[in-house]
C-alpha cells in the first residue's frame, strides 16, 4: 500500500523515464519545419555530415535528435508515413540498451528504422533480428527504400547463402536476419581455417524484434553445429587385422629381452607405443594392404590420421580387455566403470578407441555425431556491444530481462487509447462443455459479421477445434506455423467480415490483423493496377472496415490458458490495434493442463457440490486472479530453470570465449614460431620434471625412462645416460638446459631442410587442427560431465560448484594436451612443402564435405529437472528417520531455509 501511494506521488520508474524522453521528443518536433524545408539532396547529405561529426568526436546521443528528425522526414517523403511521438520514444529506448514494450499495431517495424539508422552511422553494422526468414526478408525489403534514400545499404541474411553472399550481407550498414542464422554464422566463423572464410564483422548493435520469444522462450535451447565423426569403419577393420601380427617387446630387465619387439606396453599410464622396429614393420604391412604409398612414411604429415588408427588399434588390443574394461551386449560395446563395475550404456571412449574396440570384437562400428560448436542465445546476444529489443509483451518478464541481460523494460504508451474489452475467464467442468461454449461464441460472431481469432496452445488442439467447426459447417482457416509466407497472408485477411481463424498462440506474430482485411495485400495481387482499380478496392475495404467496427472489431477467443501470462497477453494484443474496438475472452475447463496441475480434485469436487449443471460456467474476478497466480508460479519456476542453465552454460561460455579468441588471433597471425618455442620449452620442462623431480637426489632420477619417453613422444634420441657417465658435473639444471638446447637445434635443422615459410605454415596448420580436434572432444567431455553432475546432490555437494571445479580441470587438461600434442607432432613429423599444401587442402575439403547438422536443440530442461530431483531427493530418502523442519537448512545444499527453497514445492 505504501508502495502504491509513493508511486502515485512521485510516479513509477516507467513514468519518470517517459517524462525525460518526452523532452527530447520536443527538441525533435521543434526541428521538423527546418528539415521539411530541405531539398532531397540536402536531406540525403545529412548522413555524410553525421558520419563526419562522429569521426570528430561527437557521440551518437548528441546526434540523436537530428538523426531521428532526418529519418522522420525521409519516411514522410519515401513512404508517406510520419513517425508518431510514441515511435520516437520507442526509438530512443531502443538506442539506450533497453527493451521497448509496444502494443500490436503501434508500428514496431517503422520505429526500428530510427535506432537502426543512428547506430549504422558508426559504420560498424547493425543487426535487426527477427524470428523467421519471411519477416527478415519482408522487413528488409519494406525498409530498403527509406535507408537507400538516406545513403545506407541494407541486406538480408538467410539460410542457403554462400560465404561471399553472407560476407556482402554483413558488410551492409543494416543487416536483417533470423536469430538462428546470426548465431550459426558466429559458430561457423569460429570454425574457419583462414581469415577469408569468416563472414561476420565484430558484433556491434543488435535490435531484436519479438525479443521475448528470442531471449526468453528460446533461451534454453542451444544452437548446435554437429557433424558425423569421420566414417572410417573400413579403415578400422583393415588396421585391426594387422595388429595381431605385431609382437610385444619384453621389458629390458627381463631374461627374454631381445630388443626386436614391435611395441611396448605401459599399463600404469595406459599407453602402448610402437618401437622403431615396430614402425618399420607396420609401414611394410600398410604398404602391402595398399594403405600407404611405397615412397611414403607413416610419420609424414598427411598420414597423421592413419597413425592415429594404428595407435587406437594397438591400445584396443593390448590395454582393453573384454569382460573387464567392457562387455559385448546386443552387438554393442558397453563400457564397464572401472571403479564400480557397473556398465555405462550410451557412453563411448573418445579418440577413435571405441571404434577400434568395436573392430576388434567384430561388432558394428558406429559413427558418432560430434558436437563441433554450440552456443545459447543467452550467451550469443550478450556478445554484442549494444543490445536492445522490442515486443508487444515484455513487462511480465521485465525482471528476467534485467537479471540475465541487464536490459530495463520501458512500456511505451499507445498513440491512441486502448478500447479493447477484456472479459473475465469462463471455467467449465469438462473440455466438451468448454468447446460447446466456444462454438456458440464463434457462431454468434459469424452471424453479426464480427471476425474472430481463436488461439490454441498446440497444433493438436487447433486441429481438434477445426474438426468440430467443420462438422458444424462453420467456414474457417487454420494457421500452420510451418509456412510463414502463407501464415502472414492468412493473418493479414483474418480481419475480414465474419472471418474465423484458428491459430496456435505464437503463429502469425509480426503481421497486423487489419479490420476489414488488408487492402494493400489485395492490390499487390493485381498486375499493374490502375488508379481506378485501387480506388475501387479502397472504397470496398472502407465499407467492410466500417461494418467490422460496427460489429465490435476483432474478437479473440483463448481456448486454454498458457503457462505464461505473456503468451496470453500476446493473443489478446492481436485485437484493439491503434485504438480500434475489440474484445477477448478465455474459455477454460478443469481438464486443461494448467487447471489440472494447479486446481486440485478438491476444487472440482467443490464445483460439483455447488450444483453446477452441465454447460454451466464459473465467471468471477477471483477465479481469473487465482489462475494468474498459478501462471506466476510456473513463470517463476521456468525463470529459475533458465537462470540455473545459464549458470552452467556460463562456465562453458568463458572457455568458449578463450578458445575462440585464441583461435582468431592464430588465424590473423602469419608467424607463431615464438608461441611454439614457448610451448616447446613448457612441454619438455614438464616431461623432464616427471622423470627428474626438481631439486631431487640423483638416486631418484629415472634417466632411462626419460630417454625412452623423449624418443617415443618427440623423436628426440639423446644419450642421456652416456652424458651423465662422461660428465660428473652435469647436474639437474645443466642437464635440463642441454636437453632443451638439443631439441632447439634439432628443430632448427628441420627448419633449414624445409624452409622457414613452409615450417611457419605447417606450425599454424597443426596448431589449428589440433585445437579443433581437442575442442570437439572437450565439448563431448563437458556434455558427459553435465549429464551426470546432478547426482552430486545426493552426496550433499553443490552440483554447480562441482561442475565449475571439474570443468576447469578438464579445460586445463585440454590446454596441456594441446601443447603436448602440437610439440609431439611438430617434432616427429617429416615436413615437406607438399605436406603443408595437402594438409590445408584436407582441412578445406573436410570443412566443405562433412555433412554438418545445424540444430536448434531441444530445450535442455533435463539438467535442471535432474538437478532439482537430485537436490530434493535426500528429503525423500531420510523421511523415515527425521522430517526436515520448515526452518531447517534445505538438504539440497543451497544454504537457504527449507521453507524458502524446496519446501515451497510441497
UniProtKB/Swiss-Prot annotation:
Pfam families: P-loop_SecA, SEC-C, SecA_DEAD, SecA_PP_bind, SecA_SW. Keywords: ATP-binding, Cell inner membrane, Cell membrane, Cytoplasm, Membrane, Metal-binding, Nucleotide-binding, Protein transport, Translocase, Translocation, Transport, Zinc. SMART domains: SecA_DEAD, SecA_PP_bind. Disulfide bonds: none annotated. It is a peripheral membrane protein. ATP binds at residues 87, 105-109, 512. It catalyses: ATP + H2O + cellular proteinSide 1 = ADP + phosphate + cellular proteinSide 2. GO terms for molecular function: ATP binding; metal ion binding; protein-exporting ATPase activity. Part of the Sec protein translocase complex. Interacts with the SecYEG preprotein conducting channel. Has a central role in coupling the hydrolysis of ATP to the transfer of proteins into and across the cell membrane, serving both as a receptor for the preprotein-SecB complex and as an ATP-driven molecular motor driving the stepwise translocation of polypeptide chains across the membrane. This is Protein translocase subunit SecA.
